Amino acid sequence: MKNIHKIFSPEKKGKEKISVVTCYDFSFARILGETPIDSILVGDSLGMVFQGNSSTLPVTLEEMIYHTKVVRRGAPDKFIIADLPFLSYQTSIEEGIRSAGRMMKETDCDAVKIEGGSDFICELVAILKQIGIPVMGHLGLTPQSVHVFGGHRVQGKGEESSAKLLREAVALSESGAFSIVLEMIPAELGKRVSEEVGVPTIGIGAGPDCDGQVLVLNDLLGLDANFQPKFLKKFSNLHSIVKDAIESYHEEVRSGEFPGKDHSF
């Protein structure tokens, strides 16, 4: 585990960018543990990327706890943030405390992330901080509210919408959130929010002026050939690499070339 103040210190704003990667499993977490990446997010996006659902809504707290435990085993020295899934904190302050407490106790994660910037959410953030649970906020396109937004659309485009997002970002910061994810908002708004709030902003489709960036590991590795949102840069093409390797294995099994002498006892 790493010190939160070394990675998400407000003093680093505008100086050193923060790199965050979303991961769900032991094997990839172990690789991330060998890299200089600053932090790992165990996101409820696993509902779509790992489980094949059309949204994050079906993901349960038990599933998030399971995956966060697995990632911690693979990356014991990384700063790990775990998403609290849909309806694990929205029903009451008490439920939010229980869910966040379970996540911290049972997974050994370093912080939790919750979506939204309402008065209720800000109150929950403040209370969680008081009892010793660091909270990362999340504004813009908040996937747990996808039905309210009418799909995965860019948020904060109008004057009223952008002003509301800025107010919520300031409120989250003042309530004690140590960092805020900004998802799918105009780059200019991402810059403005980053300048206005006193904590690091982590962007995903929020422009280059955020204090850091986050991408899903599967996405940046190019595991899904059909997934290409505008904000995504693929740093590899693992879809083709994996497909070619499996086809080679299949051909060698069919031909009898594998297993050969080197792979037999």
Curated annotation (Swiss-Prot):
CDD domains membership: KPHMT-like
Pathway assignment: Cofactor biosynthesis; (R)-pantothenate biosynthesis; (R)-pantoate from 3-methyl-2-oxobutanoate: step 1/2
Catalyzed reaction equations: 3-methyl-2-oxobutanoate + (6R)-5,10-methylene-5,6,7,8-tetrahydrofolate + H2O = 2-dehydropantoate + (6S)-5,6,7,8-tetrahydrofolate
Keywords: Cytoplasm, Magnesium, Metal-binding, Pantothenate biosynthesis, Transferase
Family classification: Belongs to the PanB family.
Residues annotated to bind Mg(2+): D44, D83, E115
InterPro entries: Pantoate_hydroxy_MeTrfase, Pyrv/PenolPyrv_kinase-like_dom, Pyrv_kinase-like_dom_sf
NCBIfam families: panB, PRK00311.1
Active site location: E183
Cellular component terms per the entry's GO annotation: cytoplasm
Keyword match Membrane: no
Cofactor note: Binds 1 Mg(2+) ion per subunit.
Gene Ontology biological process terms, A to Z: pantothenate biosynthetic process
Major subcellular site: cytoplasm
Free-text function comment from the UniProt entry: Catalyzes the reversible reaction in which hydroxymethyl group from 5,10-methylenetetrahydrofolate is transferred onto alpha-ketoisovalerate to form ketopantoate.
Protein name, UniProt field: 3-methyl-2-oxobutanoate hydroxymethyltransferase
Residues given in the record as 3-methyl-2-oxobutanoate binding sites: D44, S45, D83, K113
Subcellular location: Cytoplasm
Molecular-function GO terms, alphabetical: 3-methyl-2-oxobutanoate hydroxymethyltransferase activity; magnesium ion binding
Quaternary state and interactors: Homodecamer; pentamer of dimers.
